[in-house]
Amino acid sequence: MTTRIAVVNAGSSSLKLQILDGSQEVAALTLERWSADAAPEELEEFIDTAGELEAVGHRVVHGGSVHSGPVVLDDAVVDYLESLTDLAPLHQPKAVAAIRALRALLPEVPQVACFDTAFHSTIPAANATYAVPWEWTQRWGLRRYGFHGLSHAYASRRGAELAKRDVADARIVTCHLGAGASLCAVRDGASVDTTMGFTPLEGLVMATRSGSVDPTRIASEHAGSS
C-alpha cells in the first residue's frame, strides 16, 4: 500500500502543490500571485479533492540556527519560522502563510518542514564564519547559512548517479540557476561551501538581487563619491 502525501512549495510569488501516491504524482496545483493574506478558494477545493492524506511536506527557505533537518510542525515551530522573516523576506512569509493555511485545512494530518538551509549545516566553521568581530557573530547569529539546499542536495545525488559515481566519494559543484541563483561545493555528499550567506541576497548576480557588493561602494556613495 502506498502513502499519499501533499508536497508544498511556497515561492516568493506562487504556491505549488503536488499530491504524491508513493512516487507517482496524481494531482498538482499552481497558484500564481500567491498572497499570504488568506487561503484562496482554489487551495481549499484542491485539498478537498486530494483524497485522504497521511502527511504534508513543506519546503521552507530558512530554518535558522535551530533546525538542521526536517521537523514536525507545531505552533512553536511555526512562530519560530515566522521570526526569521527578516532573513528571507521574499519567501518566509509565504511559506508560513501556506503552513498555517494547510494546518487549518488539515488539522489532523501531520505536517513537516524541510529547510533549504539544512543541507548547508555541514559547512565547516572556516567557511561558514564571517570575518567580523566575534561579538557580532554571537549577538546576531551571523554565519553562512546558505540556501537552495534541497535543490543542491538533489542535484549532487542525481549528478553522481548520471556520472556513475558514488556521491559519498565524489567532489561536485552544483548550480541552482533561476531568478535566485547559487553555487554549492559538495564533498562526499555534504555541503562544504556555497555562494549565498546569511541571507539569500549574497553571492551571484540574480534577477532582482545584486549579489555580493563591495561594502566600500556603499560608503563612497554616501560620501558623495562615485
PLM regions: where:
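Non-transmembrane, aqueous-exposed alpha-helical and coiled segments at domain scale
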Residues: 3-4, 93-97, 106-108, 182
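A gly/proline- and charged-residue-enriched helix-loop-helix capping module
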Residues: 80-98, 139-153
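Glycine-rich phosphate-binding loop of actin/hexokinase-like ATP-binding domains
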Residues: 122-221
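ATP-binding/phosphotransfer module of carbohydrate and carboxylate kinases, centering on a glycine-rich
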Residues: 222-226
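Short beta-strand-loop/turn "lid" adjacent to the catalytic site in phosphate-handling enzymes
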Residues: 48-95, 109-112, 118-130
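Short glycine-rich, Thr/Ser-proximal phosphate-binding strand/loop in the N-terminal lobe
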Residues: 4-38, 197
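Short glycine-aspartate micro-motif
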Residues: 4-8, 55-57, 112, 172-176
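Conserved active-site "lid/cap" helical segment
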Residues: 32-54, 84, 98-100
